[in-house]
Structures are given as C-alpha cells and as structure tokens.
Curated annotation (Swiss-Prot):
It is a multi-pass membrane protein. Zn(2+) binds at residues 116, 122, 143-144. Voltage-gated potassium channel that opens in response to the voltage difference across the membrane, forming a potassium-selective channel through which potassium ions pass in accordance with their electrochemical gradient. The channel displays rapid activation and inactivation kinetics. Residues 1-226, 299-312, 365-380, 473-635 are cytoplasmic. InterPro entries: BTB/POZ_dom, Ion_trans_dom, K_chnl_volt-dep_Kv, K_chnl_volt-dep_Kv3, K_chnl_volt-dep_Kv3.4, Shal-type_N, SKP1/BTB/POZ_sf, T1-type_BTB. This is Voltage-gated potassium channel KCNC4. A motif (Selectivity filter) lies at residues 436-441. Changing residue 15 to A: Decreased inhibition of channel closure by PKC. Changing residue 8 to A: Decreased inhibition of channel closure by PKC. Inhibition of channel closure is nearly abolished. The gene is KCNC4. Its main location: membrane. One of its GO terms (biological process) is chemical synaptic transmission.
Length: 635
C-alpha cells in the first residue's frame, strides 16, 4: 500500500513511471506514522478514515474535526480523548446522532471527490444531511441530480392540491386540524378577540364568517357543507340541462307578434314571428339563478380576501352567468328596438352558463388534476403548437405547388382540376391531415399531391406523438400525488420541548449536576456575549422540521414564548424551503445533543456534544473551559 502511494505520486511526469526509491519509501512511511486515524461514529456505525481525507473539503464540519489546531479535537486536561477501550493518544472517536447510511455517501465524497445521491433515501432527508455536514447541494453529480430533484417536484405538486384532510366519515374538521384552519381563517378575516367578554364585540360578530365560508367553499369541512355541495351540484346540473333543452324544438313556442307603428299621421302594421321558450324552463332557470345568487353573495361577504375572490376565474364565471338573467327580466317589458337588440345580445351571452360545469372541480379530484396538468404542461403545448404550425406552413405550400404540376395548358391558374385554389385553403387541409382527422372535403388528385399528402400524414403522427407522453406522465404524477394526499392520515399536534433560554439556570449544563460534567458554566460571560444558542433535537421525525437550525440573530427571541404548533401556511413554507436558504442559517449555528462520552481515564460520563460558532479572536478556552464531551469548532 505504501509503495503504491509512492508510485502514484510519480505518475504524470515526463520521465514516466519510476520505481519508488528507498528515500521515497522512508518518507511515505514517516508520513503514514505521522498521520492519525480518526473514528466517526454516526448513528452507531463506526467509520474510520484519515484526517488528511477530511481536509480535502475545507470549511465543512468534518474538515473542522480534522484540524487539530482549530479546536476540532476534544480535549480533557490537555490530553486527547479516545474511544473507550482505545489508548488515549490513539484514534479519536466522535459521535454524531445522524443517518449512518447517508454519511457513507458523504464520507465517500471526501475520498473520491464525487457526491452521489442514494436511491433508497428520501430526498428531504438527504438534503438535511447535506446541510448538517456543510456540503452544497450543487456538488451532486449530474447522474444523480434528477433523483435528488424529484422530492422538490413532488413537494411543489403536493402544495398545489388543496385537497382536504377529512376522513371518510364526512364529519366536520375535528381536533387540531380543524382548529388550525378556523384560527387561520379568523386571522385573515380581521382582528379576532377570542374571549368571553368580547363575544358581542368585533370578534363575536366575525366569528360566523369563517364557518359560513367553509360551509360554501370547502365541501369536506362538515356534513352541512357536504349537503350544500350536493345542492350546488344539483342546481348546476339542472341549469345545464335547462340550457340544452331550450334549444330543442319541443320546448320552443312560435308566436305571431303584431306591431303598430305610428310615424306622424301615418300608421303602419308589422307582423313578425318570435320564438319563446316554455315557461316551465324559465321558472326552473329562475330557481337555479336564485340559488347561485345566494351562494355568490354569501361567499363574497364571508371570503377571507376579497381581492383574491374577485380575481378567481370561477367566481367571474358565476357573476357573468347570473347577470344576464336579471337583465332579461328587467328588459322583457320593453318593446323598443334597442331593448330587443340588448335582449338578443343577452341571449347569446347566456352560453356562459355552460361554463358552470367547471365548478365541479371542487368535488372531483380528476378534474382538478386535469386543470393542474394543463397548466404544468404549458411548455409541451407550446412545443406542440410550434411543431404543428411549422408542418402546416410547409405542407400547405407543398400541396399547392404539387397540384399545379398536372394543370392543363388551357388553365393558366391551375384551379380547374383541384380544390387547392390558394395556400391559405391548404392550411385547413394540412391541419386536418396532420391531426389524422381527414374529413375528406379536400384531397389531392395528382400523383405529386398524393405523395405530399402521405408525407404530411406521417409527419403529423410523429410530431403530435412526441409531446403527448410528457403530458400523460404529468397527469399520472399529479393524480397519484392527489390520491396520496387525500389518503394521508391526519397529523396530531406533537409536543415540542422549548429550547433552553439564555437566563435559565440549566442553560449550557449537562444532565448531571456535577460541575465537571457541565459543558459550560452559566456564569461564563463570553458565551453570552457571543449569543450562543442551544437546541435539543427532541423529536427528529416531526414533519421533517426537527433539524431546522437557529441563527444567532434569533437568539434574542428565545426568551419570548414560542407557539405550540406552526400554522398550516408556516408548515408549507418550511417544507418548501431550499437547501441554500438553510445553509445560510446553518453557517452560524450549532447542534446540541446529549449522550455518553468516553473520557481519558476510561470512564463513561453523561455529557453534551456542542458545536458552537465562535469568532477567531476568542479562543475556545475563554468562552468555556474544555470538558469531557465538548467540541469547539472555529468560525
């Protein structure tokens, strides 16, 4: 092994590969004796490597451990701390309560210089581990970058769907999940003074608004909301059915209308025919419009954000579909020509009622998935349109000139024997042919035109078939994510212990009351001046936020009471946070965990493993005396 290392140092020189000399062997043996091995225990798995290997990536957490001059090696009474059972000056062992499988890839990155992403580890977990070890996510190899990015795409897709967390019973929002949403709605609707004494105040008056909003907006919030949703669905179907039946001859009545017009002393009689709809359909449509009007008014009065409500496309469709009915009722008694023109225009606008079918997206997940798929596949649709436009332009021009080849000499324009009189008409034929519809209204009649038609059909099949699989894959991905989120069980609130406050008597102390086991005395002023922050990793599996770091700037806010549970918006924002944002905070933070640590005398004590961010001008000994289980890292 030593000779191979020595030989590798000679490779690449002009003189070629030389055999190692005795001097080289002695130097390499001296280096091997001088280099110290380091043992890193991660989650119970011991990894052994050289300090020189860890120094390949300076500025990372493992590089700090390998630096003996920067306080990376814990010391007790000036001696090195080895693992229990090893000599005091031998290999030094450090313990980290992290994922051992991911650390193997991290350590291999130090050895080979290539960072690969494990396929059996969830993306957010690998992202958190990279943040903890101080490795930038951009160092991931290109072959693993797609695997690494999949979790972010999945998280963004999950955030798009606002599917409820309700169970199959159909009951209202229960326990903490419903309370969080109601509290969030109250906060959006205005200042809520939740007290018994304020029941008649503004808080009491606004307390019904989120309930009414959930009743008409969220079909899964309660049983009453489901009843309202089914009623709305019933009226939508009835309105669309009525709209379609109005065009059938069986429900149309022809009337002869006589008009007497007087212009000065001249009186004229005009007869005209009008088509009226059966009164029963008009009454049914009136009942449906009354329901939609009530629903629209309740939702706009109780909405948390009026601006967002007005900008919603479905709400605009509701308003445009309701307005023509009232205008028709108001103008029906007028017989002037202007009133008849307005009524004719309103009858044309009534087709907007058919767009109410899109309100079914609140009740059917598949329709929501289709809408999100269309929005997510915008680039593919643009690519499809560009391909189709290029093909239409090319083949319409080719078919026009190909049909001119068989023209007779007596026909200078060449239009007598073909339907392709000009290139714009060829656009229609090219679109129909490329989309494989083939209506048969236009077709080539010459052998050259038939050849162009065959090429156009083949090009259409190949062109349209390319973007379609991408759109289908997007639909499958969104649908599977939506189904998974619907079946996701409710998350109960978990108790998260608050971090130790700066003025707490237990701050910066170990679990035992012995002075020699404490990592720092509570009377050490330099530590407080530097704003050292501690954080217990009490629940490392709660929503993936247990490893969120706290910066020194947030140290002043630790003395204030913390919320017991983040709001749904805060949880969504934390889940969407990127690694780079967290790396900025992690650069000025440290991790605190408790465990057993081996001392120089061979005994095992309870201690605290602390990583602190200290400036270079202050030595670690000035901030806190080195004790067993304490590790100081330079800035």
């Amino acid at each position: 092994m030593i000779s191979s290392v020595c030989v590798s140092s000679y490779r690449g020189r002009k003189s070629g590969n030389k055999p190692p000399s005795k001097t080289c062997l002695k130097e390499e043996m001296a280096k091997g004796e001088a280099s110290e091995k380091i043992i890193i225990n991660v989650g119970g798995t011991r990894h052994e490597t050289y300090r020189s290997t860890l120094r390949t990536l300076p500025g990372t957490r493992l590089a700090w451990l390998a630096d003996p001059d920067g306080g990376g090696r814990p010391e007790t009474d000036g001696g090195g701390v080895g693992s229990s059972g090893s000599s005091g000056g031998g290999g030094c062992e450090f313990f980290f309560d992290r994922h051992p499988g991911v650390f193997a890839y991290v350590l291999n990155y130090y050895r080979t210089g290539k960072l690969h992403c494990p396929a059996d580890v969830c993306g957010p977990l690998f992202e958190e581990e990279l943040t903890f070890w101080g490795i930038d996510e951009t160092d991931v190899e290109p072959c693993c970058w797609m695997t690494y990015r999949q979790h972010r795409d999945a998280e963004e897709a999950l955030d798009i769907f606002e599917s409820p967390d309700g169970g199959g019973s159909g009951a209202g929002p229960s326990d903490e999940a419903g309370d969080d949403e109601r509290e969030l709605a109250l906060q959006r609707l205005g200042p809520h003074e939740g007290g018994a004494g304020h029941g008649a105040g503004s808080g009491g008056c606004r307390g019904w608004q989120p309930r009414m909003w959930a009743l008409f907006e969220d079909p899964y919030s309660s049983r009453a909301a489901r009843v309202v949703a089914f009623a709305s669905l019933f009226f939508i179907l009835v309105s669309i059915t009525t709209f379609c039946l109005e065009t059938h001859e069986a429900f149309n009545i022809d009337r002869n209308v006589t008009e007497i017009l007087r212009v000065g002393n001249i009186t004229s009689v005009h007869f005209r025919r009008e088509v009226e709809t059966e009164p029963i359909l008009t009454y049914i449509e009136g009942v449906c419009v009354l329901w939609f009007t009530l629903e629209f008014l309740v939702r706009i009065v109780c909405c948390p954000d009026t601006l967002d409500f007005v900008k919603n496309l479905l709400n605009i469709i509701d308003f445009v579909a309701i307005l023509p009915f009232y205008l028709e009722v108001g103008l029906s008694g007028l017989s002037s020509k202007a009133a008849r023109d307005v009524l004719g225009f309103l009858r044309v606008v009534r087709f907007v009622r058919i767009l109410r079918i899109f309100k079914l997206t609140r009740h059917f997940v598949g329709l929501r998935v289709l809408g999100h798929t269309l929005r997510a596949s915008t680039n593919e649709f643009l690519l499809l349109i560009i391909f189709l436009a290029l093909g239409v332009l090319i083949f319409a021009t080719m078919i026009y000139y190909a049909e001119r080849i068989g023209a007779r000499p007596s026909d200078p324009r060449g239009n007598d024997h073909t339907d392709f009189k000009n290139i714009p008409i060829g656009f229609w034929w090219a679109v129909v042919t490329m989309t494989t519809l083939g209506y048969g209204d236009m077709y080539p009649k010459t052998w050259s035109g038939m050849l162009v038609g065959a090429l156009c059909a083949l090009a259409g099949v190949l062109t349209i078939a390319m973007p379609v699989p991408v759109i289908v894959n997007n639909f499958g991905m969104y649908y599977s994510l939506a189904m998974a989120k619907q079946k996701l069980p409710k998350k109960r609130k978990k108790h998260v212990p608050r971090p130790a406050q700066l003025e707490s008597p237990m701050y910066c102390k170990s679990e035992e009351t012995s002075p020699r086991d404490s990592t720092c005395s509570d009377t050490s002023p330099p530590a407080r001046e530097e704003g050292m922050i501690e954080r217990k990793r009490a629940d490392s599996k709660q929503n993936g936020d247990a490893n969120a770091v706290l910066s020194d700037e947030e140290g002043a806010g630790l003395t204030q009471p913390l919320a017991s549970s983040p709001t749904p918006e805060e949880r969504r924002a934390l889940r969407r946070s990127t690694t780079r944002d967290r790396n900025k905070k992690a650069a000025a933070c440290f991790l605190l965990s408790t465990g057993d640590y081996a001392c120089a005398d061979g005994s095992v004590r309870k201690g605290t493993f602390v990583l602190r961010d200290l400036p270079l001008q202050h030595s670690p000994e000035a901030a806190c005396p080195p004790t067993a289980g304490t590790l100081f890292l330079p800035h």
